[in-house]
Amino acid sequence: MSALLMTKALRQLDPQKLAKEASCITELNKRFAVAKVGGKTLVLDTFSETLDALSFRDFENMYNNVDVMMGKSSSRLGKYWLYHANRRQYLDGITFQPGNVVAQSQYNLWSGFAVEPDDTLGCSLFLEHLKTVICSGSDLQNEYFLNWLALMVQHPGRLPEVAIGLLSGQGTGKGLFMQYLGSLFGRHYKHITDKNHLLGNFSGHLHDAVLVFADELSWTGNKSDAGILKALITEPTRFMEKKFADAIQVKNCTHLIFASNETWAIPAESTD
């Protein structure tokens, strides 16, 4: 079984436990939590890659077909969980603090790295590809990039305030390099191929991004793009906004890498 299939299997809730009074709350708590999101109180689906937020009514409707048996009587699972004293909840809202412990009353969007360190293994081929291909054999570029990557891994919550640009022809391994690098971060790695998904108003999909790969984005010379991009690279906070939901401010931990086959890869000015 692949790692992806194993992960999905582990993230499934047990239908039998959901139908029992003694286990249904604990089982639903694995996936759902009540939290303050902007000015609303909603139910977070923590298994969702985009952290879907449901209204109480929508959550109840989702589980209206499940009855919790309590002796000779029963209750609808959704309503039973919502009004239970032991439901999972974060009444002080959402925060994004990679690598940090937060208050129990807050939901930390950071879920950790997707892999565990193993001192018995090496990454010599990856490092060789980084130096000879990505950095064109330059010791200076290689050292700078390695330090940039080390900061991201050792302190994922620290904003580097510098973006990396990978410029080369097709077929040089930029995408393969990013696949391996992104696998360290799991859900905190975002592969973007549309400029609007990076700079558009609705950036909820970037809510928990640590590493963002902007792959062959097309720039039109719009000056506002440069301003938004600069803020994403340098500002300590940003707004997380989804359609039909209030925007909330979260910590900006974006480590941005661009890749392009074109000479003009990003809308940067000469002084940037």
Give the ranges of each region predicted by the language model.
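N-terminal nucleic-acid engagement/recognition segments and initiation subdomains in replication
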Residues: 1-143, 151, 204-206, 264
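P-loop NTPase catalytic core of nucleic-acid-dependent motor ATPases
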Residues: 96-213, 217, 225-226
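A Trp-anchored, charged/polar loop motif used as the substrate-binding/catalytic surface
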Residues: 132, 235-239, 259
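Conserved catalytic/switch belt of AAA+ P-loop NTPases
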Residues: 186, 226-248
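AAA+/SF3 P-loop NTPase mechanochemical coupling elements
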Residues: 202-207, 241-259
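Conserved nucleotide-binding/hydrolysis micro-motifs of P-loop NTPases
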Residues: 218-219, 261-265
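A short helix-turn-beta junction within AAA+ P-loop NTPase domains corresponding to the substrate/partner-engaging
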Residues: 268-272
